[in-house]
Design a protein with these regions (language model features):
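Exposed beta-strand face motif in extracellular beta-rich ectodomains
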Residues: 320-324, 432-437
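Beta-strand-rich structural segments
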Residues: 284-288, 327, 359-376, 436-439
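Active-site-adjacent substrate/metal-binding segments within catalytic domains
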Residues: 1-103, 107-109, 118-119
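Aromatic- and acid-rich polysaccharide-binding/catalytic face
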Residues: 122-141
């Protein structure tokens, strides 16, 4: 997570799980290593189901010792529903030894914990799947899932990984400024294939249409350090997340929220600060659980569309600065309004602090505003000052090409940070006031 790396305080894990619950998520897979006991405590209390994953697959003394340590340590956590013994073991997936290793590990798991099933993340190899209780398919396009379920009629299976659509929060066009950043595959076509749009919905529809399969996990909930694939430097982190590495929502967050939550939801993309694209045709999408959506540009209707569950609205319009809005209808009645305005440069900041039960850190989100409206392109420098008794643990902004010093020197009471596409985040420790102002 931004500002702390992998040494995540309990309160910050609580914040991350809260964010997942806001989009309707009810299960996590700890890839590709066991969770901390503190994270599992949170999952127990917050109602998450957990597939806990072993770090190394094998049956030598060291491998078995690691597996045993994980299970003995964590088997009393009610949130855990399965032990994953491995993931994408390409060297052995399609070999007899892969099945034998998986079966031996499964048998050992059952000795230590006879109450839970085992799983493994499979990326195309058939043999290894026969050695576990619940097969995890990593990307159905890499696995002939339907044929496998016919061939093994009693098989229990789930989607252990599906793609969310890689991309940078708030980026919709390739440009020199955004080198190291990228528009989401959901809008550009997966791997450049424009016949596969909104790829996040592809995996969901596959599993929703097959009730004999036990749902799916998306890769990933949050961006993470390293693996900037398909980009390279100056990208410094992955962009696979439904949220960036601060927990700020990408557009795909709202696609899943519309599917997984009951309250009316309507999200428009892109934002309407598209300087340099005046007069060009742009695609506007709507993620929603409303029955129908009518889109307006500067008050003029662009048409009304009926949107089926799991689908999305799509209009081609000429970009004209001003107001982009939409009205969502349920049962013929207007129930939701979404609105984007073209706004000028930021002239103020808005801060909000997460309400958390754990108290080992504070999470403060910062949004850059212009006369009360969010500025989705603002990348201003910000001066942060904290009162005595408050420590700045770290900060971030969700930029996948982030290269700044993210932790001030111990004892610093003032620090300069930078927003990315309208947002930044502070991780603090200790009670007391803070101030944030734009550096002119």
């Amino acid at each position: 997570h931004a500002g702390v790396g992998a040494a995540i305080p309990d309160a910050l894990n609580e914040y991350r799980l809260q964010r997942l619950k806001e989009l309707g998520c009810n299960a996590i897979r700890t890839s590709h290593n066991p969770a901390t006991p503190a994270l599992l405590d949170l999952c127990d209390s917050m109602g998450f189901m957990v597939v806990e994953e072993n770090r190394l697959m094998g049956i030598n003394t060291e491998h078995i010792a690691l597996l045993e340590r994980m299970i003995r340590r964590d088997r009393n956590h009610p949130s855990i529903i399965a032990w994953s013994v491995g993931n994408e073991e390409w060297g052995i997936e399609g070999k007899e030894c892969g099945e034998q290793i998986a079966r031996t590990m499964t048998d050992y798991c059952h000795i230590i914990d006879p109450t839970r099933v085992t799983s493994v993340g499979v990326s195309g190899g058939r043999n290894i799947a026969r050695g576990v209780d619940v097969v995890g398919y990593n990307y159905f396009v890499q696995n002939d899932v339907d044929a496998e379920m016919v061939r093994y009629a009693n098989r229990v299976a789930m989607g252990s990984e599906e793609t969310s659509g890689c991309g940078t929060r708030g980026v919709y066009f390739d440009s020199e400024r955004d080198k190291g950043r990228m528009p989401s595959f959901n809008r550009t076509g997966f791997n450049g294939d424009t016949t596969v749009m909104n790829v996040i919905g592809r995996g969901w529809r596959f599993y929703e249409e097959r009730p004999h399969l036990a749902g799916l996990f998306y890769w990933t909930g949050f961006d993470y350090r390293g693996e900037p694939n398909p980009l390279k430097y100056p990208a410094t982190g992955s962009q696979f997340g439904i949220m960036d590495y601060c927990g700020f929502a990408k557009d795909e967050f709202y696609y899943l929220k519309a599917l997984w939550c009951d309250e009316p939801s309507l999200h428009l993309l892109p934002h309407w600060n598209l300087a340099g694209h005046e007069g060009e045709e742009v695609e506007v999408w709507a993620y929603t659980n409303c029955d129908e959506v009518e889109l307006f540009v500067n008050g003029k209707s662009m048409g009304q569309q009926r949107i089926e569950r799991g689908d999305y609205g799509r209009w081609r319009v000429i970009y004209t600065p001003g107001e982009l809005s939409a009205v969502g209808y349920r049962n013929g009645e207007a129930t939701y309004l979404a609105l984007h305005n073209t706004v000028a440069t930021a002239n103020s900041v808005e801060t909000s602090e997460a309400r958390l039960q754990r108290d080992d850190c504070r999470v403060v989100d910062i949004r850059l505003m212009c006369d009360g409206a969010f500025v989705p392109t603002a990348c201003d420098r910000l001066r942060v000052a904290v009162a005595d008794g408050v420590e700045i643990v770290g900060w971030g902004n969700g930029d996948s090409a982030f290269k700044y010093r993210e932790r001030p020197s111990r004892g610093d009471k003032e620090f300069i940070i930078e927003a990315f596409n309208g947002c930044a985040q502070l991780i603090l420790r200790g009670a007391g006031d803070i101030s944030v102002e734009i550096v002119q």
